[in-house]
Amino acid sequence: MANTVLRIGIVGCGYAARVHLGRLSALDRVLVVGCADPDRGAAESFAAQASASSASTSPVAAFTDHRDLIKQCGADALAIFTPHLSHYRPAMDGLQADCHLFIEKPLSTNVQEAADIVGLARGRNRKVGVGHQYRLLPSLVEARRRLSAGTIGPLRLVTATLAQGWLATHGGAENSWRFDPKVAGGGILADAGDHLLDALLWSTGQVAVETAAVQHRLESGLDVVTAAVVRLAGGTPVTLAISGVSPGQLFEIIFFGERGRLRATDHSLLEELGDLPAQAVPLAEGGPSIDENFVAAVLDGSPLCCPADEALDTVRLLEAIARSAATGQAVRLA
């Protein structure tokens, strides 16, 4: 685009928005022009914080309705950090107003809404980036490169695990929405597990075509444990394990090929070839943040870290896993 500064409106003024604000405020080519949250106090507090960190002398405007933000602030882009079930309406309204979008993951919690966003963005020629920042991890970037190069031979099996004390560590009033399926659209699967699903699909370069799953749910319907088997388009089977009631933090994907295997975590990559001992793979330094990636994509035309059409594949798998667990039947995606 011709502008040298990206005018961004923030929709949803909770914890995630404040984290992203810290990174956006450090970028010379960004101006936060307004914010919206149904909680007026949250919107005004965020606006004050954004104004204090801005180089502009104009205060950041606060609204309780994202439509007023769109109408009054002249934003080039919206960054959406609402609870998951509330992504759709501001995304569609923003696209209708010719705004580019950054949407915190997941793109949506159901395939139809995600497809609507992708279709409208394509029709309006707008960029939509989704917050799957695990794609920027040096360990996964290098694993993807080695898989594409065939370093471990044909891929025969993948195991993917995410375990954390999600239920215990996301307490407090501000994060209480995460534990209400009617607001969040699900539990650990959609809230953190989708990072694992997206990393799996992105690193292998394949989409999922079939899955069968079981879940443990609380009385409220909140899923806290998911186990699934997935078949990728190339025929490779995958086992998935996601727990939100386990202490510590584990993110691990193991890729088994005919000539060796790769073990990727969020901070390391091990490679084993043949019968040789495992070797730590040297990793590059981390690159731009996902926020910087989005700004560069809009202003310079560089590639998005996670464009919406790719995030749609993750939503398809997320929805299929949830449906399989609910029905007790395998679900085909294609």
Sequence positions of predicted segments:
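Beta-loop-alpha module in the N-terminal Rossmann-like domain of NAD(P)-dependent dehydrogenases
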Residues: 20, 58-120
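Hydrophobic residues in well-ordered beta-strands that form the structural core
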Residues: 103, 128-130, 159, 264
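Predominantly a Rossmann-like dinucleotide-binding segment in NAD(P)-dependent oxidoreductases
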Residues: 134-212, 328
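N-terminal Rossmann-like dinucleotide-binding module
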Residues: 1-57
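C-terminal helix-rich "cap/oligomerization" subdomain common to oxidoreductases
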Residues: 1-2, 77-79, 233, 296-334
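Active-site loop of classical SDR/Rossmann-like NAD(P)-dependent oxidoreductases
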Residues: 41, 280-292
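Basic phosphate/pyrophosphate-binding loop/patch that engages nucleotide-derived ligands
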Residues: 119-127, 141-157, 233, 257
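Contiguous beta-strand/loop segments that form the cofactor/metal-binding neighborhood of enzyme cores
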Residues: 197-268, 290-303
